[in-house]
Amino acid sequence: MVKLSIVLTPQFLSHDQGQLTKELQQHVKSVTCPCEYLRKVINTLADHHHRGTDFGGSPWLHVIIAFPTSYKVVITLWIVYLWVSLLKTIFWSRNGHDGSTDVQQRAWRSNRRRQEGLRSICMHTKKRVSSFRGNKIGLKDVITLRRHVETKVRAKIRKRKVTTKINHHDKINGKRKTARKQKMFQRAQELRRRAEDYHKCKIPPSARKALCNWVRMAAAEHRHSSGLPYWPYLTAETLKNRMGHQPPPPTQQHSITDNSLSLKTPPECLLTPLPPSADDNLKTPPECVLTPLPPSADDNLKTPPECVLTPLPPSADDNLKTPPECLLTPLPPSADDNLKTPPECLLTPLPPSALPSAPPSADDNLKTRAECLLHPLPPSADDNLKTPSERQLTPLPPSAPPSADDNIKTPAERLRGPLPPSADDNLKTPSERQLTPLPPSAPPSADDNIKTPAERLRGPLPPSADDNLKTPSERQLTPLPPSAPPSADDNIKTPAERLRGPLPPSADDNLKTPSERQLTALPPSADDNIKTPAERLRGPLPPSADDNLKTPSERQLTPLPPSAPPSADDNIKTPAFHPQRMIISRHLPSVSSLPFHPQLHPQQMIISRHLPSVCGGRFHPQQMIISRHLPSVSSLPFHPQLHPQQMIISRHLPSVCGGRFHPQRMIISRHLPSVSSLPFHPQLHPQQMIISRHLPSVCGGRFHPQQMIISRHLPSVSSLPFHPQLHPQQMIISRHLPSVCGGRFHPQRMIISRHLPSVSSLPFHPQLHPQQMIISRHLPSVCGERLRGPLPPSADDNLKTPSERQLTPLPPSAPPSADDNIKTPAERLRGPLPPSADDNLKTPSERQLTPLPPSAPPSADDNIKTPAERLRGPLPPSADDNLKTPSERQLTPLPPSAPPSADDNIKTPAERLRGPLPPSADDNLKTPPLATQEAEAEKPRKPKRQRAAEMEPPPEPKRRRVGDVEPSRKPKRRRAADVEPSSPEPKRRRVGDVEPSRKPKRRRAADVEPSSPEPKRRRVGDVEPSRKPKRRRAADVEPSLPEPKRRRLS
């Protein structure tokens, strides 16, 4: 027999009934006894146990289970009722209600004194329970047993957290937990427990108010002594919420420890304030001091300044110890006020003082701040030297007569009146002084132009012989006095924008004149092509045999004018023009050869209404010429880094020749008859354009990307090469563009016109953006490039000429041959090539980007070939339009060609054909044989699905103003019925439109003629095996037939 003893300790009995059952089942898992009896035993144990101290581990109950070897179960349970009764008595006497305070314990004792059989109320659950003899242990804590255990564990964890937090704080600050802090922590715990009791309504109503008062005072005292947060009107509920979760009730051991605190200070005794103590001033917060404290010697140190509502008595050291904001009245005068008193306190003027015994000293201006003086100081001899600049905000008193060195010592901007003249003014006077007009001085000498800046003189200077040598460039911003009669070379020697009248001629002008002079035409010279920049020449150079070798590429952008023989050192000695200089004139007829500076501000401009002539002017970037009547603007080189808002705005600009425009430059004109030789920089901003209403001729202009010519009347635009990296919004918009000759267009450029009878020699790039276009309503003629002066022919042009030179057209050469399409780029030909028999073989695909020569009269299907939105009237019909014209080229009519053949669909990409090609005898040789070629030829060709990049979207209509619209030339909107399509789209027929006679009738069985015998089903034996086709092997196939290769789209 095996004896098993189970010791029921308080830790074991602290579990609830279900957990006790599980643990006992684990211990007696091998016992073969009825489960009902074992459950009864466990329930009895659970009903009779109670938490408390274990008596040195001595057993309360012994469960003795005997196991006989013969597998007969004899279970003997000895329950000593005396031990159970003793445990009940001990539990009730030592811990009648765990976690309660003295008030709760007294209430519990009163309930215990009731007789058995009565009903009582549990203090935790507020439920009525029975208290008859023999069942007193299970009446109180069976239901709330687990809640007590969780509350106890939570209290321990919270206490550990608070202690850890305080210790961590002290550890960071280099402190340890002292006995004083431990005492404060215990008092805080007691405060939380009392708040818990008040929250649960466990205190009688008669003691609640006193407890609330005690909580408030204890919180205030705790805050003052510990520095923790304090709320003056803290209630128990608010305190509980601020302290976190519901605090647990104290355990028996803790309540025994802290009973002394609760017994020493009952809540009923805290109805009156505590007696005063010596350390009240330290522990009481300053908010409780509603009356001022009596004066003390150390008030200034210990009392905050906001509590002092009345001014303090004067003291000798007030200026040092008292803050200036507390002084509501001015202080008495003192000798050292200027040194020790800060300037903020001098809000009121100082009282008048006695007359000084000593005269003013030289250091008075140093000690007194100038802003604190409401009246000027007496004059002093050394004011100009020792007085700071702030003092001179007030006018100075009259002083001694000025001396010769006054201009050096006194700044000119602080003088209200002009100074007397002096002999050395021009040498010693700073530049700031000349902001005011100068008094009349001695007659000017020859070196006045050097010493005095010209822009600060209100009157003109007399002429001088050495002006060109010694005068700085700033002087030329003011007009010169009248001089000798002008000569022919005045425009060369002096910049025109700085002269109201021409200067007299001089013999040494060619040597000593700045480089602005060279902006006008020079005399011809043999070495012009090397030494003279091409942008400053107005006429073409004479022909030379070595032009292709020695001429730089920049020269061929503009035609060179004939000029006088230049000097060799002209380009070296010319100074540059200042960037932020403007010429504002109403009558300026001509602006030529204007170079601009790269770092000019965008708002710097030349504003002129009438600009008749500005020669040799070198303009800087971000300079604008705004003119209403500007007849001629020639040789205008612009800098490439120009701001996009920099432009030349003109209403009447008849001729702009040889102008070299840089990026971010616009010419906006209403009447601009000719704009020639305008090279643009490739990195131009998309908003840079030439806007003109009347631009009859633009010749030889080299346009770079992001440049636009917007014109209503643009008769001729020739020689316009565009850069391949053009922005999609860059375009040439014209309503009347009669002639565009020799234009070399790069990708992202289109010419969209409604009436475009002829556009020749316009090669387009295959990678053109859909939004790049030249929009024109009237473009009657676009033919080959025009030249002002063609170059002489040369045999080695194609070999030795650099690529830049070919931006201009070549001179006429020998008659064209049959292979010209291969050797010469098509875009550089002025006229169409003669037909050739081997065009289909030798001509590269780029050739087909140029239009063909004029063809036969137009046909009826032209509306299909040309987009309808770009035509005001239909083009003349042509028989072979559908065959050989590429899609890009169909903006212009095609010339007549040979009749189409049947194999054109194979040789030509389908997207460029509107109709089939004529058959050819050598199709079988050039085209790889396909097994299904005949079948595919009979089937209708499947249209190819176009990509988004290949489709040409309709041009976005530009918003026009009312004044720009010409009602007479406004195209009429054509309806769908007006367009005559060559292949009409089949209409959808209705049921009523179909002829019922053509509808095949369904034949019935009776209508079938029985004379035709029904085919009989044949058997396998009836089939002739000899007629079955045999499967050929690889060896049987004839190798003579080449295997068809897979063709690519290209």
Swiss-Prot record:
Family: Belongs to the NPIP family.
Region (Disordered): 241-262, 290-574, 785-1050
Domain of life of the source: Eukaryota
Designated name of the protein: Nuclear pore complex-interacting protein family member B3
Bilayer disposition of the protein: Single-pass membrane protein
Composition skew (Pro residues), residue ranges: 349-359
Gene transcribed to yield this protein: NPIPB3
Polar residues biased stretches: 252-262
Subcellular location: Membrane
One cellular component (GO) term of this entry: membrane
Keywords: Membrane, Transmembrane, Transmembrane helix
